[in-house]
């Protein structure tokens, strides 16, 4: 993913080493369980599940692991009951941060998220205090090294399938879709044999904040690192232009 890309930087992601990949698989496993319980085990009839499966594949989760996760969620009435929880708040200099969690203990999660903000000189706000600064969009990132298709052909393939935008970055192509068109665009690219580095519905900031003060940069890094280390945290979105 391009280090200079705004889209690539909207979410603070863990490095994909072996330990981090294990955490990512655990997080996706929780998402699969919640999606199946909410809408059933068939991705064709469960849009949320289809999104999670796409995310799992983009993170190289083996198909048999995905299938086992779906079957377990569909047939195991004694599995852990995870609930969704979303927190919004402010980092240094008014940076906006959204934290999405899946948890079996909302009190624990709320305390941990609040602690992360506090340690980075930030603050938790009320629901909706920063989400209006973001747009929900489908986002597909393709590494140029993994793509044999010409950029123009790839762009036409994506736009014909319903994509809103196509960006040619330093070392990646980035495709943006409306949430409702995401699955169709992803499926069209998959059918064309395109390998995707990531594919998910995400939150894209409408504007970005540049931090110049070293203390602010240290503090927002502390917030994001603490949130990354929390197993209950699934996604973190922010408008800091790293």
Curated annotation (Swiss-Prot):
One of its GO terms (biological process) is regulation of DNA-templated transcription. This is Probable transcriptional regulatory protein EUBREC_1961. It comes from the Bacteria. One of its GO terms (molecular function) is DNA binding. Belongs to the TACO1 family. Gene3D superfamilies: 1.10.10.200, 3.30.70.980. InterPro entries: Integrase-like_N, TACO1_YebC-like_2nd/3rd_dom, TACO1_YebC_N, Transcrip_reg_TACO1-like, Transcrip_reg_TACO1-like_dom3, YebC-like. Its main location: cytoplasm. It is found in: Cytoplasm. The keyword DNA-binding applies. Keywords: Cytoplasm, DNA-binding, Transcription, Transcription regulation. HAMAP family: Transcrip_reg_TACO1 (MF_00693).
């Amino acid at each position: 993913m391009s280090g200079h890309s705004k889209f690539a930087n909207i979410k603070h992601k863990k490095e994909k080493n072996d330990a981090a990949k294990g955490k990512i698989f655990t997080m996706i496993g929780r998402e699969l369980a919640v999606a199946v319980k909410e809408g059933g085990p068939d991705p064709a009839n469960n849009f949320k599940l289809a999104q999670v499966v796409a995310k799992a594949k983009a993170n190289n989760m083996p198909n048999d692991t995905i299938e086992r996760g779906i079957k377990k969620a569909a047939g195991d009435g004694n599995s852990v009951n995870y609930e969704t929880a979303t927190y919004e708040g402010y980092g240094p200099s008014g940076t906006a941060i959204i934290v999405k969690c899946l948890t079996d203990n909302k009190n624990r999660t709320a305390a941990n998220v609040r602690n992360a903000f506090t340690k980075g000189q930030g603050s938790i706000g009320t629901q909706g205090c920063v989400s209006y600064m973001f747009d929900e969009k489908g986002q597909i990132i393709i590494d140029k090294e993994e793509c044999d298709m010409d950029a123009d052909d790839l762009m036409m393939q994506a736009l014909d399938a319903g994509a809103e935008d196509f960006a040619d970055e330093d070392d990646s192509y980035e495709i943006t879709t409306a949430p409702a068109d995401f699955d169709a665009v992803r499926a069209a690219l998959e059918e064309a044999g395109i390998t995707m580095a990531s594919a998910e519905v995400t939150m894209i900031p409408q504007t970005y904040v540049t931090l110049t003060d070293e203390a602010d940069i240290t503090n927002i890094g502390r917030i994001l690192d603490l949130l990354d280390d929390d197993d209950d945290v699934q996604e973190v979105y922010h408008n800091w232009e790293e």
